[in-house]
Swiss-Prot record:
PANTHER family: 50S RIBOSOMAL PROTEIN L9
Alphabetical keyword list: Ribonucleoprotein, Ribosomal protein, RNA-binding, rRNA-binding
Gene: rplI
Designated name of the protein: Large ribosomal subunit protein bL9
GO biological process, one term: translation
Native source species: Campylobacter hominis (strain ATCC BAA-381 / DSM 21671 / CCUG 45161 / LMG 19568 / NCTC 13146 / CH001A)
Length: 147
C-alpha cells in the first residue's frame, strides 16, 4: 500500500515522502496513529498544492524581510538616558528601549528578541544588529544621548 507520511517515522522516512508499506502496517499503525495517509491522487495533489503555497508564503516573507533590512540601512535612532559623571549612563540601554525608539521615531515595529545590542554604558553611537528569519539580517545605529 502506498502512503504519504505526515510526520517523521524513525524507521521509515521523513514527512512528505511517499512509501510503499504492507497494508496491515499502514492501516493498523501508521494511519491509525496519524503518521500517514493513504497516498491517493487527491491526497497527493492536496499535499503538493499545500507545499507550493507554503513555499510561496516563505518567498513573500523573505522579500518583506529584505525590504525591512534595506529600510533600516543608514537609520539612526536617538535614545535619551540619564547620565552621570564621565558621560556614564545610569543603567544601560535595553532591547526594550531600542524597540520603543524604533516604533516612536521611525514607525517600525520590531520584536525585541531579534535585537542584538552591544553593551552601552556611555553616551555615543552604537551599531545594532537584527537577526531576522531565514538568515536575513539588518543593521542600524542608535545614538545614546544624555537627558
Amino acid at each position: 500500500m502506498k502512503i504519504l507520511l505526515i510526520k517523521d517515522v524513525k524507521s521509515l522516512g521523513k514527512a512528505g515522502e511517499v512509501k510503499e508499506v504492507k497494508d496491515g502496517y499502514a492501516n493498523n499503525f501508521l494511519i491509525a496513529k496519524g503518521f500517514a495517509k493513504a497516498a491517493t491522487t487527491e491526497v497527493l495533489r492536496r499535499y503538493e498544492s499545500q507545499k507550493q503555497k507554503e513555499a510561496e508564503d516563505e518567498r513573500y516573507e523573505i522579500e518583506s524581510l529584505k525590504t525591512l533590512s534595506n529600510t533600516l540601512k543608514g537609520v539612526r535612532v536617538k535614545i535619551a538616558k540619564q547620565v552621570g559623571s564621565n558621560n556614564a549612563l545610569f543603567g544601560s540601554v535595553t532591547k526594550d528601549d531600542v524597540a520603543n525608539a524604533l516604533k516612536e521615531q521611525k514607525n517600525i515595529e520590531i520584536d525585541k528578541k531579534l535585537i542584538e545590542l552591544p553593551q552601552t554604558k556611555t553616551i555615543g553611537i552604537y551599531d545594532v544588529n537584527l537577526k531576522l528569519k531565514f538568515g536575513v539580517t539588518a543593521k542600524f545605529e542608535i545614538e545614546v544621548v544624555g537627558e
